[in-house]
Amino acid sequence: MIKTASTRDLRYPIGSGHGSDAIHRDPVYSYAVTLLADDQGNIGSGLAFTLGGGTQLVCEAAQFYASHVVDRDIEELMANFGSWQKLMADEQQLRWLGPHKGVVQLALASVTNACWDLWAKSRGLPLWKLLLELTPRQIVATLDLSYLEDELNRVQALAILNDHATTRIQREGLLATGYPGYDTSVGWFNYGDEQIRENCRKALGAGFTAMKLKVGSSDPERDLRRASIVRELAGNDVRVMIDANQQWTLPQAIDICQMFRDINPFWIEEPTHPDDVRAHKILADSILPMKLALGEHVPNRVVFKNYLQANCAGFIQVDAVRVAGVSEFLAVSLLCKKFGIPVVPHVGDMGQLHQHLVLFNHIAMGHPVIFLEHIPHLRRHFVHPVQVEDGVYYTPQEPGASCDLK
């Protein structure tokens, strides 16, 4: 039985140019944390990611949503969690502040993730193992698929999971080998050229075979120079991603993306405003065969549906600490599977939670193994930080979702 709910506003200034991009020049990596304590001594910890200011607003909303799950048994709650999540999301007064976006959506993510963490801990299982032990019907019961019915209803979601159940054993070897990562910290926006060179060498030495560079400068030639540095040092066999963090207008994006053709980027990420599906479609068609990656700032399954329907995303970067937590992440992953688009999450959680989810996506849904973003800057603050060696995420074994903070 869940006995108490509380929140924490945790902020971690990281400085030294770490985490900087074209829009967010001086981020303070922060979490709105929901803590759910049960009568057996377990504490579920749920995260929503912010950049500092406003975290207290998310905590206030999370406290409100968490009141809906207090005095409820975690097994009974999660047996029909999709309905409970919809009930919370549709609370009429807070819904007006969204719907399904902004502060209220982040708050719902925090509470939802705490529920999943508590469920896994109460069973003594790491989250990935809990997910894999649930039947397809139990998984679907945790999802709110409203507004997806034109593309993905409950019968179709169940069919995707059932269709891949018989071949799961062929994909379970990933649990032993680990999930490949990519280094997103090679080229933060405020880093100088020499620091980028040094970081590239370190990433290659650490076993990474993919890395990312932040672009979006007022002078595109700076971006091209930095990208050329990464490609020259990394060589042609390493995947290099370019991330503009929404900095460009559509006309700018069309022109600047062409400049990167010789760099051969694996993707170009967040080129323009995340709500502008049509702009992404025009851009995607104009820069082929280069591909777009998007989703870091997409707040809900409906907008992801629109992007998939528009056929403009080469990779979907849904983040379980921005959408409504694990449940909506799984709904979006099922939707992506239907459309044949790979999920490569953004990791506002620093990979702590998503290391579990990508294992489930591959084993239970047959999503391809590409890689998972790795950001090291908050490692010392987690009780069980991710274990990445030779560029690979080792499979976590501790009960829960790996989201406990010190």
Describe each region flagged by the PLM:
Residues 1-53, 379-381:
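Structured beta-strand/loop patches that form or line metal/cofactor-binding pockets in enzymes
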Residues 59-66, 112, 116-117, 128, ...:
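Predominant activation on well-ordered alpha-helical scaffold segments within soluble catalytic domains
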Residues 2, 41, 65, 111, ...:
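Conserved, mostly hydrophobic/aromatic
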Residues 258, 264, 273-404:
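Shared catalytic-loop signature of beta/alpha-barrel
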Residues 37-145, 149:
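Metal- or metallocofactor-binding catalytic centers and their adjacent structured scaffolds
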Residues 77, 127-130, 214, 267-271, ...:
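Flexible, glycine/charged-enriched surface loops at secondary-structure junctions
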Residues 145-282:
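Metal-dependent enolase-superfamily TIM-barrel catalytic cores that perform enediolate-based chemistry
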